């Protein structure tokens, strides 16, 4: 018995040693020193939202505003919050839309011009909603040529699959995670069919059938994607008051913000 224990211990030590050799440890002396912003504001962001949306979307927006405000602790960046889209969007490195996209012609034209001139966008859930009555062809193309098809109901957690281990938004996330309860939109045509779209996260097939009242039975179900023609990312999460209860999903949100800002034509503010 004693010999067996010694053999087992020896095997474990060998395994740990092999794992240590496989991992590449880099000395702190060989890594670029930390960058402190000091009095410098690295970038400026705008949260554009509506107070005229359904309760579950108001709940998400209220929490989203609090979440992103906490990220400004230490004055690392400036965050403005408004229900109107400013006439001049050029000062903003990113516009965050938690619950709605512009609805009137003036704001739509303003946002389109901003994005076509290198602006940044982080959109959640209902901010991407569009159907046959929306009447904004550019925005539909901006999202990948898609419109709303269906959704699960009631809101429920969803098992997510990562589709990229190299993209900055997902490279430090687990291969799978459970997204807190939400209503998830499925789209037509499939965003993946557009060569300009890069899908980063999708709903795992094990979720189906999904829903009790409104049931989604299957099919490809992208959740997070980017349009390579713009500096943007769309995240399907954003319904109710549970979306910020998961650390992995919160990291996804931070990564999304950081990535969009880091690709600014003004230069990467995190590299200063």
Q: What kind of region is each of these model predictions?
A:
Residues 52-53, 86, 102, 128-129, ...:
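Short, solvent-exposed loop/turn segments at secondary-structure junctions
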Residues 101-175:
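A glycine-rich, often tryptophan-bearing local segment used as a flexible ligand/cofactor-contacting loop or short
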Residues 1-5:
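Positively charged n-region of N-terminal signal peptides that target proteins for export
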Residues 46-131:
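Helical hinge/lid and interdomain linker segments adjacent to catalytic or ligand-binding clefts
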Residues 16-20:
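Sec/Tat signal peptide C-region and signal peptidase I cleavage site
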Residues 7-15:
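Bacterial N-terminal signal peptides
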Residues 24-30, 36, 152-229, 233-234:
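Catalytic beta-strand/loop cores that center a nucleophilic Ser/Cys/Thr
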Residues 21-42, 67-70, 206-223, 227-272:
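Extracellular ligand-binding/catalytic regions of CAZymes and related secreted enzymes
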């Amino acid at each position: 018995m004693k010999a067996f224990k010694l053999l087992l211990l020896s095997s474990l030590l060998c395994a740990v040693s092999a794992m240590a050799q496989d991992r590449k440890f880099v000395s702190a002396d060989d890594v670029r020193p930390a960058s402190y912003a000091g009095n410098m504001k690295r970038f400026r962001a705008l949260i554009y939202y509506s107070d005229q949306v359904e309760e579950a979307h108001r709940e998400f927006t209220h929490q989203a505003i609090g979440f992103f405000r906490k990220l400004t602790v230490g004055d690392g960046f400036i965050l403005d919050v408004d229900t109107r889209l400013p006439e001049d969007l050029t000062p903003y490195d990113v516009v965050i839309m938690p619950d709605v996209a512009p609805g009137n012609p003036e704001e739509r034209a303003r946002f389109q011009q901003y994005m076509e001139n290198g602006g940044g966008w982080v959109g959640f859930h209902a901010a991407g909603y569009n159907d046959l009555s929306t009447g904004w062809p550019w925005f539909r193309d901006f999202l990948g040529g898609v419109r709303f098809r269906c959704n699960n109901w009631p809101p429920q957690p969803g098992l997510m699959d990562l589709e990229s281990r190299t993209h900055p938004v997902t490279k430090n996330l687990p291969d799978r995670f459970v997204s807190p309860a939400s209503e998830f939109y499925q789209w037509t045509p499939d965003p993946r069919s557009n060569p300009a779209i890069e899908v980063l996260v999708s709903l795992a097939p094990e979720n189906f059938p999904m829903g009790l009242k409104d049931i989604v039975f299957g099919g490809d179900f992208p959740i997070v994607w980017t349009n390579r023609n713009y500096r943007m990312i769309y995240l399907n999460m954003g319904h109710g008051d549970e979306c910020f209860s998961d650390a992995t999903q919160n990291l996804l949100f931070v990564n999304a913000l950081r990535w969009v800002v880091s690709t600014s034509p003004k230069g990467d503010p995190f590299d200063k």
